[in-house]
Curated annotation (Swiss-Prot):
Gene3D superfamilies: YVTN repeat-like/Quinoprotein amine dehydrogenase. Ubiquitously expressed. Highly expressed in skeletal muscle, heart, testis, pancreas and placenta. Highly expressed in G361, Sk-mel-28, Sk-mel-13, WM852 and WM451 cells. Up-regulated in a variety of tumor tissues. It comes from Homo sapiens. Component of the autophagy machinery that controls the major intracellular degradation process by which cytoplasmic materials are packaged into autophagosomes and delivered to lysosomes for degradation. Plays an important role in starvation- and calcium-mediated autophagy, as well as in mitophagy. Functions downstream of the ULK1 and PI3-kinases that produce phosphatidylinositol 3-phosphate (PtdIns3P) on membranes of the endoplasmic reticulum once activated. One of its GO terms (molecular function) is phosphatidylinositol-3,5-bisphosphate binding. Changing residue 257 to A: Loss of binding to phosphoinositides and abolishes puncta formation. The keyword Acetylation does not apply. The gene is WIPI1. A motif (L/FRRG motif) lies at residues 225-228. This is WD repeat domain phosphoinositide-interacting protein 1. InterPro entries: PROPPIN, WD40/YVTN_repeat-like_dom_sf, WD40_repeat_dom_sf, WD40_rpt.
Length: 446
């Protein structure tokens, strides 16, 4: 989940964040400012370690890290049509690609990299950056709203199917085919997100009062939650916990809501044979005769837990993560702060603020800490083939303007392994087939 801050408050270049995003498994936070970008590790409550920082690219408004790998994707306001992919631990640029209009958002998993423009979406194979598909003539999407499942075995993509209604197009990023269309809301979409396995999709409209969860790939509604009654609420972020038990939503208000996804059952338990039980059963039966909007409201679940922010109106994003073996709610704001809360997974209620970190200072820089936590492994054959030397870089062939990509270097295979034991497994991650010469890549369009 990524957010681009609105107007920075007065106070200098680093007075606020231009953008901020949690990585796919909520173990890292990336921030962008007018001065550059930074990456932070989220392994501790008491200490926020800066993994990397760069001032080489100014005025950053998109920064995305691929899990806990060395790959980071950056877009700057100085070149808003150009995407840059870096290997930050080696201090090298892997590739850069230019597109026909400004880049609004980027999503990535270990299989696909998506570049979203206002009226098109480009789907790349992340391992060699070959353009696989260009979705043209999609409804205008001025905010670049889209979601990509982090489960690379399906790589589902979701994006708005209409500018005026809450229709969602579900697309399979592996088979490159449209799966279904979901009529999620009456109003325009404000947020969409997948759970970790790609089996559920949550959405909210611009009104921001109702959040719905659908099954994937059939698009059936599973849950409906009511965030509140206040109108004109802007949902800033919507995210599942990694185990899909919870769904949290932050907005431009001072409250973050956490909903619990209870087990869906086909039959309701019998009410107790008491007067109150009988009246409850009659009340639920009566909702069948009420107008649809009223009946739906009666069946909507309320928040399981909430967190109070000491601000409102600021751009922010939230996530649910397990840090030091306990569930935590994390909220990053455009003012340059990260708030950490404890979440009670059994009883819910009010989340307790336990730590506030500044994201604007120099912080504790530990460039090699993540490497120290992993066993030392030899470089894979795929990496050796892909990068014979720093001065002799293989390139992806150029594409037309519709294809968007102008040039780039093949990405080392070992960056996409799911864990240390697989980094040099050529059966699971075979060597990259290098693209040489001026041969054009075939571009599929729809």
């Amino acid at each position: 989940m990524e957010a681009e801050a609105a107007d920075a408050p007065p106070g200098g270049v680093e007075s606020a964040l231009s953008c901020f995003s949690f990585n796919q498994d909520c173990t890292s936070l990336a921030t962008g400012t007018k001065a550059g970008y930074k990456l932070f590790s989220l392994s501790s409550v008491e200490q926020l370690d800066q993994v990397h920082g760069s001032n080489e690219i100014p005025d950053v408004y998109i920064v995305e890290r691929l899990f806990s790998s060395s790959l980071v994707v950056v877009v700057s306001h100085t070149k808003p049509r150009q995407m840059n992919v870096y290997h930050f631990k080696k201090g090298t640029e892997i590739c850069n690609y230019s597109y026909s209009s400004n880049i609004l958002s980027i999503r990535l998993n270990r299989q696909r990299l998506l570049v979203c423009l206002e009226e098109s979406i480009y789907i790349h194979n992340i391992k060699d950056m070959k353009l696989l598909k260009t979705l043209l003539d999609i409804p205008a999407n001025p905010t670049g709203l889209c979601a990509l499942s982090i489960n690379h075995s399906n790589s589902y993509l979701a994006y708005p199917g209409s500018l005026t209604s809450g229709e969602i197009v579900l697309y399979d990023g592996n088979s490159l085919k449209t799966v279904c269309t979901i009529a999620a809301h009456e109003g325009t979409l404000a947020a969409i997100t997948f759970n970790a396995s790609g089996s559920k999709l949550a959405s909210a409209s611009e009104k921001g009062t109702v959040i719905r969860v659908f099954s994937v790939p059939d698009g059936q509604k599973l849950y409906e939650f009511r965030r509140g009654m206040k109108r004109y609420v802007t949902i800033s972020s919507l995210v599942f916990s990694m185990d899909s038990q919870f769904l949290c939503a932050s907005s431009n208000t001072e409250t973050v809501h956490i909903f619990k996804l209870e087990q869906v059952t086909n039959s309701r338990p019998e009410e107790p044979s008491t007067w109150s039980g009988y009246m409850g059963k009659m009340f639920m039966a009566a909702t069948n005769y009420l107008p649809t909007q009223v009946s739906d409201m009666m069946h909507q679940d309320r928040a399981f837990a909430t967190a109070r922010l000491n601000f409102s109106g600021q751009r922010n994003i939230c996530t649910l993560s397990t840090i030091q073996k306990l569930p935590r709610l994390l909220v990053a704001s455009s003012s340059g702060h990260l708030y950490m809360y404890n979440l009670d997974p059994q009883d819910g209620g009010e989340c307790v603020l336990i730590k506030t970190h500044s994201l604007l200072g120099s912080g504790t820089t530990e460039e090699n800490k993540e490497n120290d936590l992993r066993p030392s492994l030899p470089q894979s054959y795929a990496a050796t083939v892909a990068r014979p030397s720093a001065s002799s870089a293989s390139t992806v062939p150029g594409y037309s303007e519709d294809g968007g990509a102008l040039r780039g270097e093949v990405i080392p295979e070992h960056e996409f392994a799911t864990g240390p034991v697989c980094l040099d497994d050529e059966n699971e991650f075979p060597p990259i087939i290098l693209c040489r010469g001026n041969q054009k890549g075939k571009t599929k369009q729809s």
